């Protein structure tokens, strides 16, 4: 028992350090590319000329594609293990291919730092899980390998999103398939250790998103949250179907990986000429929506262009996650509904923010089929725990409908 406690804490601390180092590497590339280190790719896009804005994501995609293509071409052996930590936990034995995972993470660093509309957290979690896998193979029994990889993945997610409980439930709901208490203990300890280490590295304790404090929802607001869950239940499968169609369309072109990723990048670059907000994973745009939401038409325009950029990035094979982009799409859809609902003052002056947070949780639940994780994650990322009952209700509704329409989640389809 003591041994597991010590290992869990150690994995949490190292995972947080890995996430922090990856973020520092992103800031370094941002300084090289844009001479700025504020971490906002949207601000970087707005500060450069149009031709650079159009070409930078394409060049990043080309560089990442060349790296992946060269590795595949000159690697004279088949991968000894997967590079997907979910596969390693669910159907594997906990082993990850070290060299392939490192190359994939480096390629992800290149595309996310150059503006592709893909999540950076995927590589962060992969690297944390990779360290846990290497450690487990050296110091743990084979039957424990999957547990320690799960701890690394949960810790990486907790550090990236400042959400230790949601990171733990992510593993429990999606990978273990149930809340297995015997396995959940070390996972929670690793996740909490990761968050504490992250707070030390960042010099403070803050939620990922800063929002105004919301009161407990009224009965009519509970109804609207449930209604948004219903909408997300239909929107989630459509989003996944669109990503699958985009991937099929890119594959049908039969391009070499460098050219395919460059094509995805140029699409993102051209869309950024209309709205610079399409650059990056969507974090800064979500923060802006939650604090100073624009009008309905502007939100709709950004949403359409950002959605196309996400489809181009993921469809072209850009290595990265779709977790944060999904949060953006959900926030934008929710804010659109909230802006419309705000025409009726009786619904409250905070209805826009409430709907945006509900949209984030429900679309995440509809795509991951993990309602408890999605509801708790939004609460942890914002500190708005008074919304938890309503978010749980709406997320369960969203997940139920999404499962009925499309039994395969975003992680099963990848």
Swiss-Prot record:
The keyword Thylakoid appears for this protein: no
Effect of residue 406 to H: In strain: 487/90
Impact noted for substituting residue 66 to S: In strain: 487/90
CDD domains xrefs: Voltage_gated_ClC
InterPro entries: Cl-channel_core, Cl-channel_volt-gated_ClcB, ClC, ClC-type_chloride_channel
GO cellular component, one term: plasma membrane
Designated name of the protein: Voltage-gated ClC-type chloride channel ClcB
Gene name for this UniProt entry: clcB
């Amino acid at each position: 028992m003591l041994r597991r406690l010590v290992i869990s804490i150690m994995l949490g601390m190292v995972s947080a350090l890995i996430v922090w180092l990856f973020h520092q590497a992103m800031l370094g590339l941002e300084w090289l590319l844009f001479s700025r280190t504020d971490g906002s790719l949207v601000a970087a896009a707005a500060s450069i000329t149009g031709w650079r804005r159009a070409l930078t994501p394409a060049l990043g995609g080309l560089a990442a594609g060349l790296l992946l293509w060269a590795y595949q071409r000159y690697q004279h052996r088949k991968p000894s293990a997967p590079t997907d930590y979910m596969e390693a936990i669910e159907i594997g034995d906990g082993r990850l291919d070290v060299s392939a995972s490192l190359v994939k993470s480096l390629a992800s660093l290149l595309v996310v730092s150059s503006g592709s509309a893909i999540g950076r957290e995927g590589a962060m979690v992969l690297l944390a899980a990779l360290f846990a896998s290497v450690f487990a193979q050296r110091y743990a029994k084979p039957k424990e390998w999957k547990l320690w990889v799960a701890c690394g993945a949960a810790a990486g997610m907790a550090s990236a999103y400042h959400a230790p409980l949601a990171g733990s439930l992510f593993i429990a709901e999606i990978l273990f398939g149930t809340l297995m208490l015997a396995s959940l203990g070390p996972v929670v300890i690793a996740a909490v250790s990761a968050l504490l280490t992250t707070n030390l590295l960042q010099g403070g304790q803050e939620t990922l998103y800063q929002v105004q404090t919301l009161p407990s929802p009224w009965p009519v607001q509970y109804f609207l949250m449930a209604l948004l869950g219903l909408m997300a239940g239909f929107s989630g499968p459509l989003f996944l179907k669109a990503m699958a169609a985009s991937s099929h369309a890119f594959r049908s072109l039969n391009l070499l990986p460098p050219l395919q990723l460059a094509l995805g990048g140029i699409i993102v670059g051209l869309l950024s000429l209309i709205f610079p907000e399409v650059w990056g994973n969507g974090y800064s745009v979500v923060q802006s929506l939650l604090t100073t939401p624009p009008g309905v038409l502007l939100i709709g325009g950004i949403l359409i262009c950002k959605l196309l950029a996400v489809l181009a990035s993921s469809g072209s094979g850009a290595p990265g996650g779709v977790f944060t982009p999904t949060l953006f799409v959900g926030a934008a859809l929710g804010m659109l509904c909230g802006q419309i609902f705000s025409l009726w003052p009786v619904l409250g002056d905070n209805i826009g923010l409430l709907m945006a947070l509900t949209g984030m949780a429900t679309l995440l639940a509809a795509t991951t089929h993990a309602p408890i994780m999605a509801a708790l994650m939004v609460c942890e990322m914002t500190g708005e725990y008074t919304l938890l009952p309503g978010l749980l209700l709406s997320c369960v509704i969203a997940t139920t409908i999404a499962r009925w329409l499309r039994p395969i989640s975003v992680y099963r389809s990848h």
